[in-house]
């Protein structure tokens, strides 16, 4: 192994070969560095269960039995007997527990021993979906005397609470794992909380892979039914080739795949992207007449640079890459469309290639791209052109005939209410949300609390007499805010027993190592109201619903008004505490990364795989930070993360508060949707967000801080979208896609040109309340695809981009000690309305805030 040390020992990186170290040094322009050759030997191996081992690792995993009927105590005993013989020989200790239909296992040993054993365990046909809950170093063995201790859940305790709770948490965790970003999943595999990890700078090769003219496919009404199948095929092809070449999928964005590779995998990255094009070509040739898969082409841009792998957001999170090189990659991918090439990459990527591949490429010239002062030099592989216009014509002329796809999209409104997926947040407008001290002063919202609050409000004060009396069970987990003594637990028990008996509620409360796990059973409205009161209790935090579903009969008899199970109940099998605690912590972390629709559907007792693809009309919102490239090009990666994290938190708070659903967090860009009949709430969220940015600038006006230059534009548009889950190769995406998804980005972009921070299209304006429609919007001189656009009136919602750019230049100049350049102040443009559709009575309506500011009429 070779170690490269530079920056006077502040930066260290290891490599397997000397060539890799030298290549990294040259590509990173490192001048003063030292290289060392190191021989690494394990301190101990095959310790035979000894507690003296020093390089130990502990691994905990969850899996699902392929044949639950045969997993009785005798079956487990035989499994443990065989495992004990094997593990004693290689020095592995641990335990195995079964709670139908899930296996929970912990193994301890050296890295070499665990890697060998876990590879065999993963291939065992007696279980499937093997998911690691924790994997990290340990100072000593917890189960040194157990080479494989086994226990069936029925042998540990007859108490129904443990079996029920383990099943509910494990089921939800297992189902949500495939929706988790791989980077966040890798953190969980190491036993780390992704949200608690500091940003990690790295050098990466980044790509954006576009599904060519996917917007045209969505716009063609004859192809709407096949949109979900097209997306699912695209996801599977990208996952297979990216991960198969040593890369990582960062995210999917409506027909776009963002992926990255380490710099020593640059050639593999380009080969994988070429293979994606070849796989799609093969699929096109194999399709039956009428299949939209025959219209799938890919186009990609690749760039190399410094980026930061980090967690962004708290209420809804994204574990992704941030950095200026991400924006440049996107521009190169857009340039590929103009140059009619399927793969375009920058000069920086060319420098990382070997001599053999360099001989295959050809220059594609120097081109100016948006957001960069200097032109970029790009290269391509020789080959046939990819004419986007030709693809568009094929899509427009395409007719599916009698072809029927495997994933048909159905109209949301045509489904019975009971079968509609929970794609909207039903929280009543203006409902206060529980808050606790924490990052940003907010508590991460529980996935079901919005719907539960609505039910509670509708139920009224006398729920037990007149509300919904359907027998319902609800399980939640939470963390104690302070250590709980026996007296504290006794006080909780006394209060709960008296209160719950009056409302016919039974259940169980577990307290294990600071973790509360409670199940409530009773009339639905009574359970919901009690749960909402419990959430307000200051003695716990991070309250998260795990399961909520109707019951045929009570699991806990009526005489058990509330049963407490503490460490004493678990004394017969101490490892159960570790399993329950780790499972609950991992579930809490995972829930913030999974789409809200999936979480709501899952915790209501459904299988997410049964989510039906639907189409419906929504108000789409898109926002990003103005002049983000200029703001961040001279900022540190930590500052970039701080800007994005602050902005994303503000966006998710405003959107969720107004009943919207966050779709994607894309660097400094956030997209979301609102119900089609709730356009006013979308405008309110946009106003709240822009106000936050203004207040943020005011807070840092006297400080040389990048947050003092943060502003944003917001675009709102209305249109039909398809909502479907896509992918089957270990990664699942819940996608919200439609022509409006791309159009709303154009609406957001014109905010810089027209001088309004919030711009809406006419379809959105038609859905606003009469007061806002008649007195709160102003026509703009711009139109998007023939749709007139309007700005939200008011001096407080005007956007002066020139002032923002001057502020950014002044900030960078002041921080570098330079004198800022003085530019002659340009006259403000006189915006005039271009001829378009005029409504009867428009000429007589005028906004007070707009009068005297611009000589234009208010719609």
Curated annotation (Swiss-Prot):
* Domain Guanylate cyclase stretches: 205-333, 619-748
Catalysed reactions listed for this entry: ATP = 3',5'-cyclic AMP + diphosphate
Please state the Enzyme Commission number of this protein.
4.6.1.1
- Location relative to the cell: Cell projection, Cilium, Flagellum
Q: How is its activity regulated?
A: Activity increased by up to 80-fold under blue light.
Asked if the record carries the keyword ATP-binding, the reply is yes
Q: What is this protein called?
A: Photoactivated adenylate cyclase subunit beta
